């Protein structure tokens, strides 16, 4: 019976994902490959300081993107849950990228990560994270689970807080979409010769969302006391409507 309930809950989530907007977020998905032209568009973005990575979204296509998020709660806990994903299918050049998500307060409730196959039928990763889960931004390395993304395929991924394992329809879920693409030729040489501090801006200008988030987050991990880096990430997230994530 628990298996049937779990399958029904997952089916409901996927059905929502394939529909129209949820919680005010649009759901665009698979898009054209990023081009070298995106690298030239950064100069057009004048509203952000030069030190803040400016994200240039790729052209958008079929449905897909961020769902859920916002402040949710149970009788035991109230928290904000969000994936660090755009409101469209975000790009990465990595075969085994990292996925980032945020929870505003610690929780002792079970937290599960699911990555669905491109058809949205079977999970290629389904795991429960160690409890308790601390407040803040969390990183999931797909390499830790031997999960690889195929080029040109869009995957949907979810983080779920499970208040009642017997009633999975009560899960509090946030999700995003990710697609692996080839790195533009003009970007390869720039990345190879650039200092790590320049990588967030280079990836952002090329429309590579997940690589941008990973690059700025890795700088934060290397210098956790540098508040300017955290402010840069906060400003980057705000560009895709992710506010309230200040950690």
Regions found by a protein language model. Name each.
Residues 39-44, 48-61, 85, 89, ...:
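Extended, polar beta-sheet/loop recognition surfaces of beta-rich domains
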């Amino acid at each position: 019976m628990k298996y049937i309930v779990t399958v029904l809950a997952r089916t409901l989530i996927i059905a929502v994902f394939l529909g129209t907007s949820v919680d005010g977020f649009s759901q665009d998905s698979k898009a054209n490959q990023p081009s070298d032209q995106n690298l030239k568009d950064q100069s057009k973005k004048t509203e952000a300081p030069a030190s803040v990575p400016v994200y240039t979204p790729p052209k958008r296509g079929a449905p897909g993107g961020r769902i859920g998020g916002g402040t949710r709660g149970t009788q035991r806990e109230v928290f904000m849950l969000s994936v660090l994903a755009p409101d469209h299918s975000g790009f990465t050049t990595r075969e085994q990228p990292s996925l980032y998500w945020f929870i505003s307060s610690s929780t002792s409730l079970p937290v599960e990560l699911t990555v669905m196959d491109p058809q949205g039928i079977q999970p290629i990763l389904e795991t429960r994270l160690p409890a308790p889960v601390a407040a803040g931004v969390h990183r999931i390395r797909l390499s830790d689970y031997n999960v690889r993304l195929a080029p040109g395929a869009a995957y949907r991924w979810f983080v779920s807080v499970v208040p009642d394992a017997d009633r999975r329809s009560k899960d509090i879920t946030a999700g995003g979409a990710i697609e692996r693409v080839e790195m533009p030729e003009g970007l390869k040489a720039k990345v190879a010769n650039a200092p790590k501090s320049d990588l967030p801006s280079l990836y952002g200008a090329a429309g590579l969302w997940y690589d941008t988030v990973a690059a700025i987050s890795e700088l934060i991990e290397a210098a956790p006391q540098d508040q300017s880096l955290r402010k840069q990430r906060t400003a980057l997230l705000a560009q895709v409507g992710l506010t309230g994530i200040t950690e």
